[in-house]
UniProtKB/Swiss-Prot annotation:
It is a single-pass membrane protein. It comes from Papaver somniferum (Opium poppy). Its EC number is 3.5.99.14. This is S-norcoclaurine synthase 2. The 40 amino acid N-terminal extension should included a signal peptide targeting the mature protein to the endoplasmic reticulum.
Length: 231
């Protein structure tokens, strides 16, 4: 029996287990290496606007903003900007195509966060675009900060992760320029709407003079009324 009973089965089991552990450790090491080979970047553009935070946020958070950008604020910029899923709220997916020569030419993006309390909107790229050029993650973040009751700051950020070997190339391609354009046209749109009286645009420099004239007219009219002078 001593010749029949050996430790070979236990040796085989030990070898199988040790090989399994080694493979798991090797797999974990590769995962750590892959994670370490990703570069995370964040770039930002701030624009101060002389109007309330709520008025600016009302445009950024508007469910109709895809149509507004395509047809009103940035006409001619997009070859296509279609809502293919959702109604303008969280979960909405846009299919965006730019004219030939643009980089990137096309991509799909998704609204993943619209926080009215914080005035925060986050949109991630889910297909095409920079994801086909070395990025593993790309997000636009818009945060509207109130500065005073009549002024605010539009904080436009881009957060992305890219494979280390593509980091230099993508740093040259990814800029805040698209978000800058959006912030400028939206703020201009809000200011123009706010400064209209009876359909006529009132330039910012004339606001104080207009208000002063209105006050003087009211004072004169009030004085004439008190004095019994017919108006």
């Amino acid at each position: 029996m001593s010749k029949l009973i050996t430790t070979e089965p236990l040796k085989s089991m030990a070898e199988v287990i040790s090989n399994y552990v080694i493979q798991r450790e090797s797999f974990s090491a590769r995962n750590i290496l892959n994670k370490n080979s990703l570069v995370k970047k964040e770039i930002r553009y701030d624009l101060e606007v002389p109007t309330s935070a709520d008025s600016i946020w009302s445009v950024y958070s508007c469910p109709d903003i895809p149509r507004l950008l395509r047809d009103v604020l940035l006409p001619g910029v997009f070859q296509k900007l279609d809502v293919i899923e959702g109604n303008g709220g969280v979960g909405t997916v846009l299919d965006i195509v730019f004219p030939p020569g643009a980089v990137p030419r096309s991509y799909k993006e998704k609204f993943v966060n619209i926080n009215h309390e914080k005035r925060l909107k986050e949109v991630i790229m889910i297909e095409g675009g920079y994801l086909d050029m070395g990025c593993t993650f790309y997000m636009d973040r818009i945060h509207i900060f109130e500065k005073t009751p009549n002024s605010c700051v539009i904080e436009s950020s881009i957060i992305y992760e890219v494979k280390e070997e593509y980091a230099g190339k993508m740093a040259k391609l990814i800029t805040t320029e698209p978000l800058e354009s959006m912030a400028e046209v939206i703020s201009g749109y809000v200011l123009k709407k706010r400064l209209q009286v009876f359909g006529f645009e009132i330039k910012p420099k004339l606001r104080f003079n207009l208000l002063l004239c209105l006050i003087i007219c009211l004072v004169i009219a009030g004085g004439m009324f008190v004095a019994g002078v017919p108006l």
